[in-house]
């Protein structure tokens, strides 16, 4: 509900409708996505994801442990700082800002992710991602030599190892939330990029 209406510099007012399936439809196959429309730029934005869980789930694909593969695509507009938000970037409360954020970019992303979690809270995530970004608003990309670049493209592979002994979480429809912070979480991650892909 808190993402139905929001605002940013490019969209001005933004309307969004989201949907996702639960294990009530299928205990292995999960779909989720959204469609959003910006009143100022008159562009549709979207995200769609298909996730297959090799383990039977009671309600959500986020339930522990995970053994799943997901494929997603997304086209949207965002500020560079939106990638660091702990919540959804379309949360209506993120629209309340003390100053105008007008450096934004349209981005198109394709993602394949595999997650495997062991009973001892050790997990492995492997991911392939391709992103194209086009600056908008007052944002621009320039080479060291001063040439304006119309878009940035990055293709990358990430391998992440995570160990969270004693971790307890609450699973919501979209994500997990830790309920205890008494134990350490160890994460080792490596990302490598591919040139000219």
Model segments located where?
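Exposed, low-structure sequence patches enriched in small/polar residues
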Residues: 1-197
């Amino acid at each position: 509900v808190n993402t139905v209406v929001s605002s940013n510099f490019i969209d001005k007012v933004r309307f969004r409708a989201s949907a996702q399936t639960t294990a009530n439809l299928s205990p292995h196959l999960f779909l989720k996505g959204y469609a959003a429309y910006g009143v100022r730029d008159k562009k549709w934005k979207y995200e769609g994801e298909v996730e297959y869980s090799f383990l039977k789930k009671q309600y959500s694909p986020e339930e522990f442990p995970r053994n799943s593969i997901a494929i997603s695509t997304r086209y949207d507009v965002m500020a560079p700082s939106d990638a660091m938000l702990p919540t959804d970037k379309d949360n209506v409360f993120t629209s309340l800002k003390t100053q105008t954020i007008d450096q934004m970019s349209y981005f198109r992303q394709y993602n394949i992710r595999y997650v495997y979690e062991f009973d001892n809270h050790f997990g492995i995530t492997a991911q392939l991602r391709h992103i194209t970004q086009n600056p908008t608003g007052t944002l621009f990309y320039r080479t060291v030599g001063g040439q304006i670049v119309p878009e940035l493209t990055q293709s990358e592979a990430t391998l992440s190892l995570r160990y969270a002994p004693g971790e307890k979480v609450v699973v919501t429809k979209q994500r997990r939330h830790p309920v205890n912070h008494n134990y350490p979480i160890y994460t080792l991650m490596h990302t490598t990029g591919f040139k000219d892909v």
